[in-house]
């Protein structure tokens, strides 16, 4: 009995000590330091008009490069030339792959590696069936109150026009940067991305290695982490991989009045159901752990604050909670989802083939080959043929060091355009042109101070004018 009592007492003491340690760590957690941002400068003259005009030119990049609307892209080039005369007088311009551009602004110290500011100006199309759901013309560039509407307002003409406005304004003040600044603009990021590939090839031919590359992708968010009651700067330091797989079933069809027990559609449907039921492994990556650590002291949700400040004990719980939300799930696991289904030619014909396209965004530490094998095991049916397809696939990218001066410079600039920002490293769940630039720089980051971008790739894409102001100030800080 004495031994039992001693054991029970020891267990109780251990629980009390453990609980005390957890509570001490929780209550002692320090919030990220607050910082008052500088006042936003007034927009340059005609800046809003220029953004509106840019949006009104429908630079849609088709999946088939041969079907590009050259006249529209040439119109956009003419717009840039007329809107930004100082840039076209003082900077050299290379036209790459027909419609991508590299502007070179020589710095005072040629020994310094250049800064690359990049964006893309092509956009995705607007679904005809969704036109009636828009409250403004998709390519109208209409300003309503404090917001500008239109395809590309967020993704990604805001970035491009903000960069151009920044440089044009600095040129008018006779400013010369210390290091050379390259402005790199792709014209088909939303399709093949070959413009960016060609730009990087050109820079490699010139033996250029960049100190820093800043592209779209990361943003300011208030809505996604509402319990913080502070804005968070999601600064992209790397990207998940990207791969598309075809699942194909071939089986003799026939007349719909005499169906077999199983058809090609049945087999494929069951395969997709099984695939969606299998969860890829969940892991907290090192940058994601740093992300959670930085926000942990500012949470107003006590259970969440306790869990985040004691990941050594609650990591499983945090993984579970993050997995309940689509944004959180994308941060901790490879995602696999069907995006296209094809089968059948008539209502009274049983098809002999059923095909699905499945898109995957691959967590760093995993590979395309491993995900293909995961799909094969999940489906577990040799009648379903699985292969990689699509015009583009890439393994997860290397990561930029979030302790580097490059990350700090972007974090400091983000903190100077919005009050009380918490800058965090973020593994991008989408693919951008910047992945190509890792061949010429170890300092690739993804960020533009847009706040919870609305409607991009969807309905009523729109940008608060204040975000446009922030973007111009952000790029000015990076250059200066």
Predicted regions mapped to residue ranges:
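N-terminal Sec-pathway targeting helices
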Residues: 1-16
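An extended, acidic, His-containing surface patch that forms the Zn2+-binding/catalytic region
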Residues: 93-95, 102-104, 108-112, 221-222, ...
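A common structural junction motif
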Residues: 121-122, 275-280, 376-385
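Acidic/histidine-rich catalytic neighborhood of metal-dependent amide-processing enzymes
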Residues: 147-234
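Short amphipathic alpha-helices in soluble, non-transmembrane regions
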Residues: 262-263, 371-379
């Amino acid at each position: 009995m004495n031994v039992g009592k001693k054991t029970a007492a020891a267990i109780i003491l251990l629980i009390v000590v453990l609980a005390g340690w957890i509570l001490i760590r929780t209550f002692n957690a320090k919030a990220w330091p607050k910082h008052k941002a500088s006042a936003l400068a007034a927009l340059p003259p005609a800046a809003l008009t220029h953004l509106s005009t840019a949006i009104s030119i429908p630079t849609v990049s088709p999946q088939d490069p041969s079907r590009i609307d050259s006249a529209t892209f040439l119109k956009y080039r003419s717009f840039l030339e007329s809107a930004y005369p100082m840039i076209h007088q003082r900077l050299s311009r290379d036209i790459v792959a027909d419609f991508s551009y590299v502007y070179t602004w020589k710095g005072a110290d040629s020994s310094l590696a250049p800064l690359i500011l990049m964006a893309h100006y092509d956009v995705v199309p607007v679904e005809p069936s969704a036109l009636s759901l828009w409250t403004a013309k998709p390519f109208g560039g209409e300003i309503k109150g404090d917001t500008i509407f239109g395809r590309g307002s967020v993704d990604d003409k805001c970035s491009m026009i903000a960069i151009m406005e920044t440089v044009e304004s600095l040129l008018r003040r006779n400013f010369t940067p210390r290091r050379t600044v390259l402005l790199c603009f792709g014209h088909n990021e939303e399709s093949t991305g070959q413009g960016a590939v060609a730009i990087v090839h050109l820079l490699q031919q010139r033996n250029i290695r960049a100190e820093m590359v800043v592209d779209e992708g990361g943003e300011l968010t208030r809505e996604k982490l509402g319990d913080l009651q502070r804005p968070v700067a999601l600064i992209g330091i790397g990207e998940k991989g990207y791969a598309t797989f075809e699942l194909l079933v071939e089986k003799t069809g026939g007349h719909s009045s005499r169906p077999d027990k199983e058809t090609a559609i049945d087999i494929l449907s069951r395969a997709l159901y099984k695939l969606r039921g299998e969860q890829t492994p969940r892991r907290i990556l090192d940058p994601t752990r740093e992300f959670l650590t930085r926000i942990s002291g500012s949470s107003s949700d006590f259970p969440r604050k306790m869990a985040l400040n004691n990941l050594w004990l609650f990591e499983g719980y945090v993984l579970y909670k993050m997995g309940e939300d689509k944004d959180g799930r994308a941060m901790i696991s490879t995602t696999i989802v069907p995006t296209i289904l094809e089968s059948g030619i008539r209502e009274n014909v049983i098809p002999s083939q059923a095909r699905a396209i499945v898109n995957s965004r691959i967590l760093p530490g995993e590979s395309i080959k491993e995900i293909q094998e995961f799909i094969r095991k999940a489906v577990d049916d040799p009648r379903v043929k699985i292969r990689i397809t699509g015009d583009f696939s890439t393994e997860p990218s290397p990561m930029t060091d979030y302790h580097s001066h490059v990350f700090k410079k972007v974090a400091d600039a983000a903190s100077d355009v919005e009050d009380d920002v918490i800058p965090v490293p973020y593994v991008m769940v989408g693919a951008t042109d910047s992945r190509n630039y890792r061949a010429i720089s170890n300092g690739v980051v993804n960020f533009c101070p847009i706040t919870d971008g609305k409607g991009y790739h969807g309905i009523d894409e729109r940008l608060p004018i204040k975000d446009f102001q922030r973007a111009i100030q952000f790029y000015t800080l990076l250059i200066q």
